[in-house]
């Protein structure tokens, strides 16, 4: 993350969900760091890939995983953290 003072609140249920990959949990944590007070964020896939040190394809896969488990939802270009 470019701003080292950035932080986020992560739900315990996400951290302990055995159905969720550790990579998706890490991405969720990063999304929480980008979220505003309404739990909405809109970082680019490229930015998320850079933050994770992974490919854009991997980030897209983890976003799908988080959506499948209903931890996030997409509305247009924005993600809402549920």
Where do the PLM segments sit?
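N-terminal leader segment of winged-helix/HTH proteins
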Residues: 1-4
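Winged helix-turn-helix DNA-binding recognition segment
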Residues: 13-26, 31-82
């Amino acid at each position: 993350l470019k701003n080292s003072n950035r932080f986020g609140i992560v739900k315990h249920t996400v951290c302990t969900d055995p159905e969720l990959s550790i990579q998706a949990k890490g991405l969720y944590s990063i999304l929480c760091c980008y979220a505003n007070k309404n739990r909405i964020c809109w970082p680019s896939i490229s930015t998320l890939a850079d933050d994770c040190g992974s490919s854009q394809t991997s980030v897209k896969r983890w976003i799908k995983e988080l959506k499948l488990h209903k931890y996030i939802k997409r509305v247009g270009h924005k993600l809402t953290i549920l």
